[in-house]
Amino acid sequence: LGLVGSEMCIRDSIHEKLTRQITLTMPECDENCEVAYAISTAFIERIPAIQELLLKDLSANFEGDPAAYSKEEVLLSYPGMFAIFIYRIAHELYENKVAMIPRMMSEYAHSQTGIDINPGAKIGEYFFIDHGTGVVVGETTIIGDNVKLYQGATLGALSPAGMATNPNVRRHPKVGNNVVIYANSTLRGGATEIGDNVIVGGNAFLTSSVEPDTIVS
């Protein structure tokens, strides 16, 4: 009973502090903002699902790296895992329309790891970033399950003159399942779709789609 009580106290404390921080991003709210409380409640209820995703990411990072001797090593020392951990939480807040906080979280991870994952990106299960430095994943990127990115991989947007930001238009690539993108490769544009089971070799530059089961060298 004591353990259960402690867990409930921790949960309530997180709920209270998160509600307060969300309220600070909403100028129209007072200290007892019901909208902020509802968002915080929805986030707390999603924690088990976030944990499940992170455990799958941890497995992908451990099983995908022969140099890793334990999951504890990956969790405590791998920059890719750290960036993914923060992304999963920030993305949940982003999906709940929380302003500013998700981006602050992603920029903190960026400053600590050199990995820039926008919280708006949609990333599937078993996500693995190897080495990590210089990886960029843009806001409207869609990534499937079991995808591995190596250092310097960029999933970015094209920047034609006068292009305006439109949240309803995908500006970044879509990547299928079981894809490997090797070091310093760049994939750009919302029309770029990478099929399942594709390998993108190092230093590639793609602005067009790739059929499934293809090796790009």
PLM segments and residue spans:
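Extended, small-residue-rich solenoid/repeat segments and analogous flexible loops
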Residues: 55, 59, 69-76, 80-135
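Left-handed beta-helix
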Residues: 113, 118-119, 124-125, 130-139, ...
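Amphipathic alpha-helical segments within well-ordered protein domains
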Residues: 19, 23, 90-91
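Regulatory activation segment
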Residues: 164-171
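Short, small-residue-biased leader/transition segments that mark boundaries at the very start
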Residues: 2-9
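Hydrophobic alpha-helical segments and helix pairs
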Residues: 25-83
